[in-house]
Amino acid sequence: AGGRAATARALAALGVSSDGLVQVDGSGLSRDNRISARQLSALVHAVLASGGESAALWRGSLALAGQTGTLEKRLVGTPSAGRVRAKTGFIGGTSSLSGIATSLDGRERVFAILVNYPDVDGLNNSCWKPMQDEIVRFLVERLP
């Protein structure tokens, strides 16, 4: 209960609504946790807008497409490589990618892509990565 209250206070301090947020555990591993893409994007934006050392440390902790962490093998050989910093997420039936995409003209765009899918044969996290990558490439390479 203390963790949920602390999360609600932190979100409120950043100006992010906690309406509809369901936090069952602090690790994010419960299938019953819930956050909307809008809330997640608002959180990313608020952390970046807060500036200072915390924002810089958080940004630096995110994987860099085509170079580091869970994004090391994604977007390789595309103009988007090195322009996307993001956090991946996966738990059975859910695949997510959220973070910051820097367009070719230098504009930063915050995004959150959350996919829920049925637990049936043949569907797994790797089915959704190409779609997530295409959305991010659109943000970097083609969105005016």
Please report, for each region that a protein language model flagged, where it lies by residue:
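Short, gly/Ser/Thr-rich active-site loops of penicillin-recognizing serine hydrolases
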Residues: 130-144
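Short, Gly/Ser/Thr-enriched beta-strand-loop segments that form substrate-interacting elements
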Residues: 73-105, 114
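A small/polar active-site loop signature that marks catalytic segments
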Residues: 1-56
